[in-house]
Amino acid sequence: MKNFIFITCSAPTQSLAQKISKALVKEKLAACVNISSPIQSTYSWKGKICSEKEFLLFIKTKKSLSKKIEKRIKQLHSYECPEIIALPIVQGSEDYLDWITTQTL
């Protein structure tokens, strides 16, 4: 299971979230990307407390592709410092994990 990761990334608009998700899947960097309904994010940025509507991407992929995904998200994203957080997948359906392998580089 240590070969698979789950990456989260937030985007300010649904259209940007879709643009990122389609690029990652088309380029075989991710097997699947889910996009949440709008969420409310509160954060500190440049000394100000901000609260914005965002769309959260849930990216399923192989650990070996994490740096390529980070680079691609940064190329497409409008934020100066986009959220890109990877978590290991510690357990999952063997069939689903095999599918991730067949759908990615």
Show which residues each predicted segment covers:
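Positively charged, small/polar-rich N-terminal and surface patches that mediate targeting and assembly
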Residues: 1-105
